[in-house]
Amino acid sequence: MSGAVPFGAGAVRTGAITGDEAIRARFGLGWPGFRLDVDLALPGRGVIALFGHSGSGKTTLLRCLAGLERAADGYLAVRGELWQDEAQRLFVPTHRRPLGYVFQEASLFAHLTVRRNLEFGLKRVPAASRRIPLDQAIALLGIEPLLDRMSGRLSGGERQRVAIARALATSPRLLLMDEPLAALDVKRKQEILPYLERLHAELDIPVVYVSHAPEEVARLADHVVLLADGRALAAGPIGEVMARLDLPFAHDEDAFVVIDARVAAHDEAYALTRLEFAGLPLWITGLDMPLASRVRARVLARDVSLALTERHDSSILNVLPARVVSLDEADPGRTLVRLDVAGTALLARITRRSAAQLGIVPGRDVYAQVKGVALLR
């Protein structure tokens, strides 16, 4: 990219993520009543969710990544290219960064057809730099039937799909999405989510996705940054962050964890499908999916009970060997238990009486009885 600088040594904290494929970001800026102060090392692939309440700094951080805000204390390296280093007075402006930006409201030209909107997005990208063919972007978002329609006559979901395709057509090295589903009703959201999942599965570019909706984060994200008051409270793989007892996720009434698994077998006689994760089975209502398909499941903390022995005289199909990692007893009547199941985090919410009777303490081996499993993708 013209204006990009090869990545070299930098002062930014890298944490556990290293190498030229990582995203390394440090920003410090503010105004009366708010200050953003983050120092992050993020993966260079997959969907990275910026999650937090309104005013937590999600969009400000996204704008810093885009170069729309210039932090006086700023450093940004994206997959081997240095985009900002204020210590060197280096700042690559937005129009010279190979990124795509999708806003809450699709910013299309209403007087142009969908095809013309897409072609407009290609104008600033030299032919030699086009790594994502326009036809591929069109196919990924399923918009071929819309190409000759006027953009002003599209539904909200259709407009967002076109906006995402236009962003992809610029062959970005980083795709930024600022609550792209926020303006859509439930039906339109459900229509567009499968297309976002396809981007995740088929494109090798990092996507930074802003959302305050836990269900979107659970379905799409690989990595989560939890923001509050302009600071990062936590950052890490979604399965780890969602299960941390010191974070708000785990204390929600609908607290859950996500489990990435594969389809291992179908039991047609009982209309069930056996998923497998970490070598363990997880039964779910029958799926019409090929064997070896990758899926993501959700398990609510309230749907997990504990036993000291493996029970075979119960209607519960999913009984998993586990070890107690930690407890939270902030609720006067209930105990939240974090479990380790063959390296996968699981949460169980049980009564304090049950925890006392069973002797639930860190290090105790137990059996997690999972009463319900929902498929996210």
Curated annotation (Swiss-Prot):
ATP binds at G52, H53, S54, G55, S56, G57, K58, T59. Residues 313-377 form the Mop domain. The keyword Membrane applies. It catalyses: molybdate(out) + ATP + H2O = molybdate(in) + ADP + phosphate + H(+). Keywords: ATP-binding, Cell inner membrane, Cell membrane, Membrane, Molybdenum, Nucleotide-binding, Translocase, Transport. InterPro entries: AAA+_ATPase, ABC_transporter-like_ATP-bd, ABC_transporter-like_CS, Mo/tungstate-bd_C_term_dom, ModC_ABC_ATP-bd, Molybdenum_import_ModC, Mop_domain, P-loop_NTPase. It comes from the Bacteria. It is found in: Cell inner membrane. Its EC number is 7.3.2.5. One of its GO terms (cellular component) is plasma membrane. It is a peripheral membrane protein. Residues 17-254 form the ABC transporter domain. It holds the Pfam family TOBE. SMART domains: AAA (SM00382). PROSITE patterns: ABC_TRANSPORTER_1 (PS00211), ABC_TRANSPORTER_2 (PS50893), MODC (PS51241), MOP (PS51866). The keyword Translocase applies. SUPFAM superfamilies: MOP-like (SSF50331), P-loop containing nucleoside triphosphate hydrolases (SSF52540). One of its GO terms (molecular function) is ATP binding. Belongs to the ABC transporter superfamily. Molybdate importer (TC 3.A.1.8) family. NCBIfam families: modC_ABC (TIGR02142). PANTHER family: ABC TRANSPORTER I FAMILY MEMBER 10, MOLYBDENUM IMPORT ATP-BINDING PROTEIN MODC 2. Part of the ABC transporter complex ModABC involved in molybdenum import. Responsible for energy coupling to the transport system. The complex is composed of two ATP-binding proteins (ModC), two transmembrane proteins (ModB) and a solute-binding protein (ModA). This is Molybdenum import ATP-binding protein ModC.
